[in-house]
């Protein structure tokens, strides 16, 4: 890690936000503390922005793997484990899973309505499923749909087709035929977003890929594929944000699938009221809800430059381009629990190989650096890369991230003191 300290990179006051009152002070953020160690690699057990701490903040959910620089194949397991923060970071293995990747791990979530209980994706009896596990008793419940997002109350999930995703975006899909990928169907009318009741196990197809064909980028390649990915509920679980993509020339791309075209959408939780977030050419990449109506999304502003945007659902034409140029990169944006700050980490540039990380004060768009983290050559492969993928603890007193700056893929925490 490059120790940049808390150097103000930019202070950009919008005319509408200037006033005589003092802005909210930036918090003090500690240096990173490793809570896992080699020789094996470790990462948070879920995608960025997802809470990894138990209700009492004692345990942190992680994955452990022997694989370093390639995608996992069908039948190659990672260990789901808990780090005990009150017992010298003791690692407690609790399960195995063969549906995982280095980006979203196994999409593990703690369930707030059940004590000592987590869910994660796995392959059981040849099918991709969700496993609900009480890690202390070992009791399991199987939901026959893998999760892509879970509501804040833990009662609902969105499910997508991870077998199709393995073909169209390998670093986010799962190996094996645990779902019907429908490889020869460009616009499936029987697949898309599934709303899953995590208590009953019942699911309903709320939005099909085919239903959005006229609003997505069209394909000339007869072997192209359209698909949905990257879903997230708003805090009250009344709306869903998701990305819809088309991808062509799959057979010619033996090393990297990169020619996808993205359209960002929101819809109500029943699949109605579908809204495009941006005009043609803007795409969309990373995202998070600030509240029930406000989203941050990294997108290609005015089809010119990738940057961070904020907008209100229903008022998409009033979208703001924030950061005065400093935030013109594709970052993993997430909001602090108090809603006053936004964290975002980006990708390294050629010949530099350091991942930047910044904290934005939303009231005046002042920005400070949280450091720059070196990426060794072994972790520069697209499919096995190590993004920082931060996430706040629910009380805002810690932020965690994955990193390879000390030579191997490990999990780190930073303490936060709010002023």
Residue ranges of predicted features:
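Surface-exposed loop and turn segments in beta-propeller and other repeat-based domains
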Residues: 33-43, 93-102, 201-224, 368-382
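Conserved blade-ending motifs and adjacent loop-strand segments that build the rim/top face
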Residues: 281-283, 322-334, 366-391
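Blade-loop segments of beta-propeller domains
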Residues: 47-49, 67, 73-123
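Short, conserved, GDST-rich strand-edge loop motifs in beta-rich repeat architectures
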Residues: 63-77, 160-190, 242-260, 300-302, ...
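Beta-strand-rich domains and repeat architectures in extracellular enzymes and scaffolds
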Residues: 33-78
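Loop/turn-rich, solvent-exposed surfaces of beta-rich toroidal or solenoidal domains
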Residues: 305-306, 323-368
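Asp-box/WD-like beta-propeller blade repeats and closely related beta-sheet repeat scaffolds
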Residues: 99-192, 206-222
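Blade-terminus and WD-like Trp-Asp/Gly-His loop motifs, strongest in beta-propeller folds
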Residues: 50-60, 100-118, 122-123, 148-156, ...
């Amino acid at each position: 890690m490059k120790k940049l300290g808390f150097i103000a990179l930019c202070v950009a006051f919008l005319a509408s936000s200037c006033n005589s009152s003092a802005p909210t002070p930036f918090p003090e953020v500690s240096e990173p503390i490793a809570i896992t160690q080699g020789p094996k690699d470790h990462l948070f057990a879920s995608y960025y922005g997802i809470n990894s701490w138990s209700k009492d903040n004692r345990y942190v959910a992680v994955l452990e793997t022997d694989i370093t620089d390639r995608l996992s194949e069908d039948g190659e397991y990672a260990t789901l484990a808990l780090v005990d923060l009150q017992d010298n970071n003791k690692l407690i293995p609790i399960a195995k899973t063969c549906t995982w990747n280095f980006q979203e791990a196994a999409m593990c979530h703690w369930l707030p309505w059940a004590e000592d209980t987590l869910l994660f994706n796995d392959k059981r009896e040849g099918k991709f499923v969700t496993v609900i596990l009480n890690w202390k008793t070992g009791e399991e419940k199987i939901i026959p749909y893998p999760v892509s997002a879970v509501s804040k109350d833990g009662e609902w999930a969105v499910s997508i087709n991870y077998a199709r995703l393995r073909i169209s975006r390998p670093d986010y899909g799962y190996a094996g035929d645990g779902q019907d990928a429908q490889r020869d169907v460009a616009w499936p009318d029987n697949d898309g977003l599934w709303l899953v009741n995590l208590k009953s196990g019942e699911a309903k197809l709320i939005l099909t890929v085919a239903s959005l064909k006229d609003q997505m980028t069209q394909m000339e390649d007869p072997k192209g594929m359209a698909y949905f990915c990257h879903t997230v509920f708003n805090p009250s679980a009344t709306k869903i944000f998701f990305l819809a993509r088309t991808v062509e020339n799959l057979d010619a791309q033996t090393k990297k699938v990169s020619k996808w075209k993205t359209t960002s959408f929101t819809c109500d939780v029943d699949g109605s009221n579908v809204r495009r977030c941006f005009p043609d050419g803007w795409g969309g990449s990373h995202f998070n809800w600030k509240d029930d109506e406000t989203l941050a999304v990294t997108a290609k502003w005015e089809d010119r430059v990738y940057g961070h945007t904020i907008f209100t659902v229903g008022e998409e034409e009033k979208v703001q381009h924030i950061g005065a140029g400093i935030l013109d990169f594709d970052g993993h944006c997430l909001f602090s629990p108090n809603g006053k700050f936004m964290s975002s980490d980006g990708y390294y540039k050629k010949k530099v190989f350091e991942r930047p990380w910044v904290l934005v004060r939303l009231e005046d768009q002042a920005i400070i650096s949280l450091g720059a983290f070196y990426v060794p050559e072994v972790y520069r492969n697209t499919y096995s890369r190590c993004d920082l993928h931060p996430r706040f603890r629910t009380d805002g007193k810690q932020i965690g991230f994955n990193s390879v700056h000390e030579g191997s893929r490990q999990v780190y925490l930073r303490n936060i003191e709010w002023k």
